[in-house]
Regions:
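PP2C/PPM-type serine/threonine phosphatase catalytic core
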Residues: 1-67, 73-349
């Protein structure tokens, strides 16, 4: 795919055109492992579910790795749909460039995963920005803008079977929790968090953002929202990344909804993930979930539910179903009806 060249920061005049080198008379042919809004827009379906998930296998070096991802979309589904199809491909391409030695180095893998997250987000955001100024149809521009005007968190887990290591990269407030039984079959089960909640309620995130944008005292609300959003890191979200002039042009030309007019030093948000890894032991299981799940269920309760299911495997199937139902009722009834947030969860072991 040809890389789009977005207008420089501060570019905001409708009579100026950004040169992206695309064929505006038809959809161009793109590699299927690279994001291209023109090709991908052909398969978009209208739906109301903003969250998405992915899982599968990918060859890394000579090993058959596994991946699992959850994508918590907001302001629409366009961004999470892009991440479902492309994020693991961007990561795989970065891993393919590593030597055999580096594939055994967790720090090198961390750098590769971070680079893939940033590269895909840059393409999403810059492609939407370029679409405002190119001589294309309004419909095509809207399709290209959508993934950047919507937003999504991303949580991606990779499992290296040769080293029995799982690598977790997260941007946003989705969460990964490992369940592990200590001291053999008779030990207690523990929950091990493998991600960081990137939200306005995280003091470390508040300190980081305030340090990057000194003197801007309206970034966080009293309720802890960051420029109107609960998350501090995400894909897309042009309102927190585009220059002020571009947001005005988007508002005037494409009915864009701009909530914050006090834009001084964008970008404010980033898709840079925190990356963690852990050596997997026999019997471990991994839970990936969006914040809609974790708002209702603690790390410990989630591990407890899966533990009941594991222990029920050797029991009568009717009792197994009963245990699962009881666990779900106990953990969810505390907050029933208090949240309209979407829930997306993946459990693997």
């Amino acid at each position: 795919m040809e890389k789009h060249n977005a207008p420089p920061t501060g570019h905001g005049r409708g009579d100026q055109k950004a040169e992206a080198g695309r064929d505006i008379n038809g959809f161009r042919v793109a590699r299927r492992d690279r994001y291209d809004s023109n090709r991908y827009s052909e398969s978009w379906k209208r739906h109301n579910v903003e969250d998405d998930l992915s899982w599968g296998r990918m060859m890394v070096g000579n090993a058959d790795w596994r991946y699992w991802g959850v994508y918590d979309g907001h302001s629409g589904w366009a961004t999470s749909s892009i991440l479902k199809e492309f994020l693991h491909k961007y990561v795989r391409r970065k891993l393919d460039k590593l030597s055999a030695k580096d594939l055994n180095d967790s720090e090198a893998i961390e750098v590769a995963m971070k680079s893939a997250f940033i590269e895909l987000d840059d393409e999403i955001v810059s492609d939407g920005l370029a679409a405002i100024y190119e001589p294309i149809t309004h419909a095509e521009a809207m399709c290209r803008i959508a993934p950047s005007s919507c937003g999504s968190c991303a949580l991606l887990a990779l499992y290296d079977p040769e080293r029995s290591i799982v690598h977790i990269a997260g941007a946003g407030d989705s969460r990964a929790v490992l369940g592990r039984q200590q001291d053999g079959d008779n030990g207690d089960w523990v929950s091990i968090p493998l991600s960081v909640d990137h939200s306005g309620s995280n003091p470390d995130e508040m300190a980081r953002i305030n340090a990057e944008h000194p003197g801007e005292d309206r970034l966080f609300s009293a309720a802890g929202r960051f420029l109107g959003s609960e998350v501090t890191r995400s894909f897309g979200d042009n309102r927190r990344k585009w220059p002020k002039e571009a947001l005005e042009d988007w508002k005037n030309g494409f009915f864009g909804r701009v909530y914050n007019t006090d834009i001084q030093t964008p970008p404010y948000a980033t898709a840079l993930p925190d990356v963690k890894n852990i050596k997997v032991e026999p019997g471990d299981f991994l839970i990936l979930g969006t914040d809609g799940f974790w708002n209702h269920v603690s790390n410990e309760d989630a591990v407890y539910c899966v533990r009941l299911w594991i222990e029920a495997q050797a029991k009568d199937i009717s009792e197994q179903k009963r245990n699962i139902q009881i666990a779900a009722q106990v953990t969810m009834s505390k907050h029933q009806g208090r949240s309209r947030n979407g829930i997306c969860i993946r459990i693997t072991g």
